[in-house]
């Protein structure tokens, strides 16, 4: 088959209008294993295919792109970088986006290869074309360009090529295309900045990080909403958080939240700003962040009471993030009756809100109530029990009711709540004393889809592996759980059939 492909490739090179041959070659290549093509890589002459891309013939272009995609996979990245440099450069300025995407996918292979990447770094014109691809209308082209530049910047040589040459001017020039392209460049800068303190230093020296932060704290509310997402990404890294603190950015974000009450357009950016602090609290210290920025906690409580589903959703997510570790749980507990009212509100929403918000409420409840066995002190167990009882008059029945609704995602989210409390003795007693609950747990006929079966299995596993379960549930029920566990999540009980004499 490889020999047939090579023969057709030679025919394509020989003829002036080889449309039929391209169709045949395309068809043959689908059947040739890649390892066979690799053995013939030295004989693959791709020049004619690249030339055909310039003919402005739609079908030829489509066929050539597909053929080249297959043949280039058979070539080593170093070979592509050294021998097809001109073709790569032309590909990046081709009017057809599929050609650009093909070219960028090859550049993606090259930048992943430590031997080949130097060929790119030494080709200023090619780098410039990659930068200008960020400014194109096609999002896939822009994303591929950002990915390649981000990968290049992982090395010292790459950082120097991007930030200590004319490329920086090209980046700044591309940013002027429009707002969307400017945000794409910011996205690239934040990706690079997040790698290491040194990478961040290159990006701050370029002035682009400072420009982003100016927009974040500027007057345009829509720009703020976009910029806060990128700044939150930077805050996921320790060096990023340090930089934001040193530059006073965290204080500025807090001050904007303080002033949000008098801003009629605050609903555009407030969710992102509150999310920022929620992530910050979990990554650093919930207690320190909440004590230093009390407006953050205050705003979360306000948003939960809001009638705006967007605000409620963000507040619920943030409470879930904040309460995902013990320190955060204790910070919330200190707010006393306010937090009890908040729990009642979340419990109410988990029953009455639209499905998407119900799921977010259930996820937050799971996060708040979960306690790893090694952290189950008497005080913390009393706290989670008290929180659970604040959710509703009969929380166990509330979540059983939710789990019986015909939405797999909702069913799984309710099972996740049971799983979160399954290793806590007070919850095990509640489950055991709730009529029919143990039967519900071991009943395999309730779940019909894979996700639900997996979620039920996690609940059974959490119960069966608890040290207190045998004592509270009793040995017969404990053995039923162990049997379920050993049979796995997808076990189907065999149906016995009896042969009847004389039956057809």
Swiss-Prot record:
InterPro entries listed in its UniProt record: ARM-like (IPR011989), ARM-type_fold (IPR016024), PSMD5 (IPR019538)
Keyword Chaperone part of the UniProt annotation: yes
Record's keyword terms, sorted: Acetylation, Chaperone
Keyword Chaperone recorded: yes
GO biological process, one term: proteasome regulatory particle assembly
Positions carrying N-acetylalanine: 2
Annotated function: Acts as a chaperone during the assembly of the 26S proteasome, specifically of the base subcomplex of the PA700/19S regulatory complex (RC). In the initial step of the base subcomplex assembly is part of an intermediate PSMD5:PSMC2:PSMC1:PSMD2 module which probably assembles with a PSMD10:PSMC4:PSMC5:PAAF1 module followed by dissociation of PSMD5.
Quaternary state and interactors: Interacts with PSMC1, PSMC2, PSMD1 and PSMD6. Part of transient complex containing PSMD5, PSMC2, PSMC1 and PSMD2 formed during the assembly of the 26S proteasome.
Annotated protein name in UniProt: 26S proteasome non-ATPase regulatory subunit 5
Species: Homo sapiens (Human)
């Amino acid at each position: 088959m490889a020999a047939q492909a090579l023969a057709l490739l030679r025919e394509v090179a020989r003829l002036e209008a080889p449309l039929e041959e391209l169709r045949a070659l395309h068809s043959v290549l689908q059947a040739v294993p890649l390892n066979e093509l690799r053995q013939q890589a030295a004989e693959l002459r791709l020049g004619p295919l690249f030339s055909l891309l310039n003919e402005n013939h739609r079908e030829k272009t489509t066929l050539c792109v597909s053929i080249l995609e297959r043949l280039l996979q058979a070539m080593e990245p170093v070979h592509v970088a050294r021998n097809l440099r001109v073709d790569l450069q032309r590909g990046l300025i081709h009017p057809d986006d599929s050609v650009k995407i093909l070219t960028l996918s090859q550049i993606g292979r090259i930048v992943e290869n430590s031997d080949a990447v130097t060929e790119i770094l030494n080709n200023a014109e090619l780098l410039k074309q990659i930068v200008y691809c960020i400014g194109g209308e096609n999002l896939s082209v822009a994303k591929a360009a950002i990915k390649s530049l981000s990968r290049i910047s992982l090395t010292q040589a790459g950082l120097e090529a991007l930030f200590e040459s004319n490329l920086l001017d090209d980046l700044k020039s591309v940013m002027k295309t429009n707002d969307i392209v400017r945000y794409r460049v910011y996205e690239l800068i934040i990706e690079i900045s997040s790698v290491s303190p040194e990478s961040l230093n290159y990006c701050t020296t370029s002035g682009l990080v400072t420009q982003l932060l100016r927009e974040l704290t500027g007057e345009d509310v829509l720009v703020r909403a976009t910029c806060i997402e990128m700044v939150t990404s930077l805050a996921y890294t320790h060096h990023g958080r340090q930089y934001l603190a040193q530059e006073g950015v965290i204080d500025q974000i807090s001050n904007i939240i303080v002033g949000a009450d008098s801003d009629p357009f605050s609903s555009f950016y407030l969710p992102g700003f509150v999310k920022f602090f929620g992530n910050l609290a979990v990554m650093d210290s919930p207690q320190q962040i909440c004590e230093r920025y009390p407006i953050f906690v205050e705003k979360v409580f306000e948003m939960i009471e809001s009638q705006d589903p967007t605000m409620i959703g963000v507040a619920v997510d943030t409470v879930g993030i904040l309460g995902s570790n013990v320190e955060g749980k204790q910070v919330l507990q200190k707010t006393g009756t306010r937090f009890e009212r908040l729990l009642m509100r979340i419990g109410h929403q988990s029953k009455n809100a639209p499905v998407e918000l119900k799921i977010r409420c259930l996820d937050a409840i799971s996060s708040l109530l979960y306690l790893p066995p090694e952290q189950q002190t008497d005080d913390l167990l009393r706290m989670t029990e008290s929180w659970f009882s604040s959710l509703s008059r009969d929380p166990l029945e509330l979540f059983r009711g939710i789990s019986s609704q015909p939405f797999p995602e909702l069913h799984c989210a309710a099972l996740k709540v049971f799983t979160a409390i399954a290793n806590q003795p007070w919850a095990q007693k509640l489950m055991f004393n709730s009529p029919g609950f143990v039967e519900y747990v071991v009943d395999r006929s309730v779940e019909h889809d894979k996700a639900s079966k997996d979620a039920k299995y996690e609940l059974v596993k959490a119960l069966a592996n608890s040290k207190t379960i045998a004592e509270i549930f009793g040995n017969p029920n404990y053995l039923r759980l162990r049997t379920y566990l050993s049979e796995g999540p997808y076990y189907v009980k065999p149906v016995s059939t009896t042969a009847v004499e004389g039956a057809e």
